[in-house]
């Protein structure tokens, strides 16, 4: 990374990044393929290109040249055999260049991000704990109980391919790199379509190219979120203490001022509608939450301006169904695998004034999270652990594994679900899911041994599956010895958030 910093400092500009020359550097491909510099790189053979001991700049230049040449040949030559050979070679060429190109596009943002993290480490102790997904829920517990409304937002998708390039153009003004990116998108998608078709997205966003997909998607989502930050910053004289530093880009403020409603001549007047000091924004993947203490009218204004911003910036037609405004005390919202709501509890207090006494109900708001059973059952159906009615079925794909491996796989899924859903106030839904997985494991073992579940339990007993129901308090007592005392016991219904979870379980993620 220090070598990259020196390279960009030579230019003298934070935005005029010349990334294209890095495409011909050896260490880029070493990073892309997780190889050391003296490991497996390129060599040219008579039939195709594979990896070997030496890297050649001529090879990369030739790959790029042949990509452009074969693109024109495929339009001129009608020979089916030649076109089939061209397509086979193109897949290899694109895959080779894409892996290095993905790393190159991330370099300037990685430098700024790492420097920002280093600065925050000095201000925020234990900042690494904020990487945990569970770190979001203590924040919601602390903030949402004081708010009134929440907007459930789905970020617009799909998007026109040229918009993805224009989003990056605001950050990086290296024309050759952007032209190469546009060429990749043109080749792997139907350029005549206004949206990204699902069938043509399969190769570019395949498992081998997820890095480039995540980079493009995150840059697009960042552009969507910038509208919120811009409007909030312009509506306050004091900067919000909870807003993080964003990457500097060009032309954004000029574009944002041309939103249909927020025009330049009446900018301050329009932004006066957004003066709400209690507003919070959280996003995970394509879904975000915008919560406010303001009125329903204020939330409708936010919705209206977001819809106009999407239409003017990304050329989306009005999509009001992507933003739902709910009152926290009446509706719950699904976010990050939990069904969350703000519950109002009334406590009766006896008050006495002089000789008279009376009872008074005092309402208190409490943030509540439960495990939604229907999405989890749907995920179990997709994974073929049960049928649509919730009845456990065997897993034939795992029947060829050893008994220990089968039990370990089912047990790992149960432990991960219990670990992630430890913040639920009600565990009945989680117990049902664990019961389905336990019986599915038994059916899989019985299928393997060509026996029945009852005979299998009778012969071996049910103790071999007890790890599925390991008590949470026993696990915590091993981690925190102080919890062994009666005064520090974990009470029933008490929520526990872990700061070591950096990804959602696949079953939760698919729900």
From Swiss-Prot:
Keyword annotations: Chloroplast, mRNA processing, Plastid, RNA-binding, tRNA processing
Keyword Chloroplast: yes
GO biological process, one term: tRNA processing
Pfam name, any one: MatK_N
Signal sequence extent: none
UniProt entry tagged with the keyword Membrane: no
UniProt-annotated location(s): Plastid, Chloroplast
A single GO molecular function term of this UniProt record: RNA binding
Example of a GO cellular component annotation carried by this entry: chloroplast
HAMAP family listed in its UniProt record: MatK
Its biological purpose: Usually encoded in the trnK tRNA gene intron. Probably assists in splicing its own and other chloroplast group II introns.
Family of this protein: Belongs to the intron maturase 2 family. MatK subfamily.
Protein name per its UniProtKB record: Maturase K
Organism: Acorus gramineus (Dwarf sweet flag)
Biological classification of the source: Eukaryota, Viridiplantae, Streptophyta, Embryophyta, Tracheophyta
